Amino acid sequence: MLRWLTAGESHGPALIGIVEGVPAGVELTSGQIRDALARRRLGYGRGARMKFEQDEVTIMGGVRHGLTQGGPVAIQVGNTEWPKWEQIMSADPVDPEVLADQARNAPLTRPRPGHADFTGMQKYGFDEARPVLERASARETATRVALGTVAAQFLKQLGIELVSHTVSIASVTVPEGRPLPLPKDVIALDADPLRCFDRETSNAMVAEVDAAHKEGETLGGVVEVLAYGLPPGLGSYVHWDRRLDSRLAAALMGIQAIKGVEVGDGFLTAARRGSAAHDEILKDENGKIVRQTNRAGGIEGGMSIGEVLRVRAAMKPIATVPRALRTIDVSTGEPAKAHHQRSDVCAVPAAGVVAEAMVALVLAEAVAEKFGGDSVPETQRNLQSYLESIPATLDSVGR
């Protein structure tokens, strides 16, 4: 069983992630994690923080000489801006007079619409939003990307690879029927300003971001994650919480600012007749059982079917809007403009990288449940044995 947990605040000394249940023998280095975190900072329309924010990665346990050891893997992502926040975010009590001299410590009493600020203050009894936004911040996703790197490395050694890309920015959308990116296309994808696989659409997306920036607006969009090389049978139909699509949806909805998830053709399927909504099961000239379409996105009945997994996540426009939204100053009870420090115009490309990490964690957990071994070679043998045992052709069904 794969379990993971993160801790830390946006402006704290570091973020911490721990993942347990990783078999021995997964190839992992701090450089691979740094590369993944660098991808999280990609994207046209990002704010100033991406320019000065550096991710200092330290593997604290569970890895020796580039290989996992079978124990929990602990990763620390250090905050290079910590010296500026050391007094304000100190875990130990600080002299109030010292804090009073620091402008950064001004109480955040104007909660931002669309954020966790106000409800978090109500729930936990805070008189300002700082304690809420420090943990609710999307900065926490750096740890998820780090842990997702561990999961992705494990999956890769089993022949499973993931790709994420941007499908839409605001109303600018990749036309239906365009080719899907493959694992070999990741470098080219990451070089694109919006991580979009269609150049013409990418150019239109850049123009959309520029227009929003001039107008003091923010933009959302849709990202898609593809998983290649999955065997059939991950997940289960026997309970709702074991369904692979259920677990993927929960993981993606747990990403900050994600407001919708679909698997395969998703909501488009609801507008179709039944005869055009499903993937018929056929046989090819060799008698191999195949599906000519993949409208289901690689999942039927809560289980992977051996086709390409395809899931999408819709990200709302960033809630910290430069042209500040209306709110109430909780210290006075009077109408006010919401607090605004700095923000991105568009963070959809980064959301794709985070979504990719979350899908990797879910799939790694499902693989460990089905084929789990104490080491990578044992897991590989279990997977190979399973693949050899399931019918691939009509001649072998029932044997």
From Swiss-Prot:
One of its GO terms (molecular function) is chorismate synthase activity. It comes from the Bacteria. Keywords: Amino-acid biosynthesis, Aromatic amino acid biosynthesis, FAD, Flavoprotein, FMN, Lyase, NADP. Pfam families: Chorismate_synt. It catalyses: 5-O-(1-carboxyvinyl)-3-phosphoshikimate = chorismate + phosphate. FMN binds at R135, A136, S137, Q256, A257, G301, K316, P317, I318, A319, T320, R342. Its EC number is 4.2.3.5. Signal peptide: none annotated. Pathway: Metabolic intermediate biosynthesis; chorismate biosynthesis; chorismate from D-erythrose 4-phosphate and phosphoenolpyruvate: step 7/7. The keyword Methyltransferase does not apply. It is an enzyme of class 4 (lyase). Its cofactor is FMNH2. GO terms for biological process: amino acid biosynthetic process; aromatic amino acid family biosynthetic process; chorismate biosynthetic process. Belongs to the chorismate synthase family. This is Chorismate synthase. It comes from Paenarthrobacter aurescens (strain TC1). The lineage of its organism: Bacteria, Bacillati, Actinomycetota, Actinomycetes, Micrococcales.
